[in-house]
């Protein structure tokens, strides 16, 4: 495990239940999360798989749902072959999604830990804000 983490937050003018739906419904996920195809049955212990294309190359990221508290919070592990690291437990990140009512609608936080390097953190620090902006555009559009 590493101590490298990142966290990003955004306010969205939509109710928490609507945000939760966009975070956990595959056809909506693809609209805000860079066109990925997502598979999961959203149960603790179940797999979560994201398939897509990055820089012209297909990829498959995978993990497991480890915590689920509808419609407030879910946590899943995450490993990507694009990391270049072996598919081993110590190479999985933990991704936390928190959905909280706010005066403007909903505050959404995504946090990631056990990032393998500062370079990986830099990629996350570019990707998560864009994904959250895409989520807001989908829900407020």
Predicted regions and their residues:
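Surface loops and adjacent helix of pleckstrin homology
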Residues: 34, 53, 79, 111, ...
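Hydrophobic/basic alpha-helical segments enriched in Actinobacteria
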Residues: 8-9, 36-38, 69, 100-104, ...
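Hydrophobic-ligand binding "helix-grip"
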Residues: 31, 38-43, 57-103, 113
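Hydrophobic pocket/interface hotspot
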Residues: 19-20, 29, 48-50, 65, ...
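A conserved amphipathic terminal alpha-helix motif
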Residues: 113-141
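Intrinsic-disorder/low-complexity, polar/charged segments enriched in Ser/Thr/Lys/Arg/Asp/Glu/Gln
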Residues: 3-9, 16, 47, 60, ...
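Short aromatic-glycine motifs in intrinsically disordered, low-complexity regions
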Residues: 46-56
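Hydrophobic ligand-binding cavity/cleft-lining segments
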Residues: 1-39
